Amino acid sequence: MMKIYQLLVACFFLLCFFSLEAQEQKKLDAAQTMLCQGNYFTESEGKAFLDGQKNLYTTQKEWEKRAKLIRQHILKGAGLEKFPKKCPLNAIIGEKRVYDGYQVQNVAFESLPGVYVTGSLYMPTSAKGRLPGILSPHGHWSKKGDVGRYRPDAQKRFAAFARMGAMVFGYDMVGYGQMGELGWTHSAPEVLKLQLWNSIRCLDFILEMGADPEKIACTGASGGGTQTFLLAAIDQRVKISVPVVMVSAHFFGGCVCESGMPIHKDLNFQTNNVEIAACIAPRPMLLVSDGDDWTKNNPEVELPHLKYIYQLFNKPDLVQNVHLPNDKHGYDLNKRAAVYPFLAKYLGLDLSKAMNTDGTVREDMIVIEEQQALYPFDNQHPFPANGIRSNDQVKWEK
């Protein structure tokens, strides 16, 4: 009799286990159907979606209500409805390397207990008082010798911004750089959540370092453009947004860090990256686009919709687009030549430190460092004992 009872109890617990497992799988399957990835819309569908959305907001108040809803859905879809408790940053800051008009220090800090964000801090050598702050995330460049924030084009913009008078933090995406070598990967399912949280903590870091809270900008290209407009949408401490070659009515991002969680859609809600980018309105925003990727329609499709939203605030001139029809995807020279004057204007930077009076770019004095030279962990600054070495070890506070 006892054996039969034990068998029945065991069967009951097995049924409960498989029932819970089935429920969790059902939730996962439902979330998957809500994903908007890559070319989720055709170009014509993207334009039609924006045209239809105008009926939802014909006044400033109606747009503000819509923007609030978009922010809520981003945070809900990313699993950040409730922020985890912010741990001390415990920043590890390396020695200064001084160059012509700027200096560089490698940095690591904790975004969550044991989770280290790695990057480099660029500053003008003649810094006085509170400096404007620029966060600059990178895109998905991952070929050996041409990786993320270590690429020459990235180092050039970091250094140029610093020469112009800004505090600049260029930081690694999850699984890139030294953390990738330690065991982290960029392909984990919830990398969007951690990456967005890391960007929030990067803002905390530059503010803790003394950046002017009224002059904070974010700019990056491709996947770095996605990080730019997502952060600007959900964190109002970002005062200026410059997403490069990314904002599109029809393309939602092809990486799990951009669209691998249901931030764009649920059963009763749909948005796209144009509306997400617009959440910063009426603060200044510059789109930089080219003729060879999903931003090719910016002058005819995305910009007019953004102008429509900014006009609701009577500030249509605060959103701009520089379109380069003969350029390709990247943050190359022509893109930087478009961004430098915009950030100089709105952050009060010295444009002469990066551009000549004839409009040509001045970057010949900038030193391109080797990738390993930009790593924060070395013999003098070893990887901390509490440091997490893989995505699956991350603990989110419930």
Where are these regions (language model features)?
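Conserved hydrolase catalytic core segment
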Residues: 233-239
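Mobile cap/lid helix-loop segments that gate and shape the active-site cleft of serine hydrolases
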Residues: 215, 239-278, 283, 290-303, ...
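Alpha/beta-hydrolase fold nucleophile elbow
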Residues: 210-222
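Glycine-rich active-site/cofactor-binding loop and its immediate structural neighborhood
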Residues: 94-149
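Alpha/beta-hydrolase-fold serine-hydrolase catalytic core, especially in secreted/extracellular enzymes
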Residues: 23-116, 288-398
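Glycine-rich nucleophile elbow surrounding the catalytic serine of serine-hydrolase chemistry
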Residues: 220-230
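Bacterial Sec-dependent N-terminal signal peptides
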Residues: 1-28
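Cap/lid segment of the alpha/beta-hydrolase catalytic domain
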Residues: 128-208, 247-257, 262
